[in-house]
Amino acid sequence: MKSKLPETGTQGKFSKEYAFARALKDGQVRMHHMTDEAVQDPEIRRWMEKIKVFHNSELEVASNQYAEETGPHAERMLVRLKSGRVLTEEEIFILGMARRPLAFEDVRFKYKDCGSVAGLPPEDIDTIISLATGLEQLNDLTLLLQHLSSERKPSWTK
């Protein structure tokens, strides 16, 4: 379901062009950027048209030699400036994969971001994080399960 120039938020989730354009504009890509409206942002659409994504078998070989790295392949980004200068950045091990796991604060941030878009109240998100962080010390999972199986419907199901 990869989409070079996505039209919908769902397509945007699978578009490197969209992710790169959004990160360049906003410094990061968050869940609220995965809406139809955000993908249709005229400035983002202009940036996406300038972004070219190419398959690089050299990086794929480097990435695939590690069995546990079954997720996204290594990436190399080249940015050509108007001056002609080229900036390059390369990552063999994608952040969040086994060899470059997220720090706990990054996991917490991602969960809060996803939970807020899903319509969970901030206090419930904090309670779930707190309970999950101390999971090994819990004698009873009832409270955690109650928060995880709330009667509230996530915003995307309305």
Task: Locate the predicted segments by residue.
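Terminal-appendage/accessory-domain detector
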Residues: 1-158
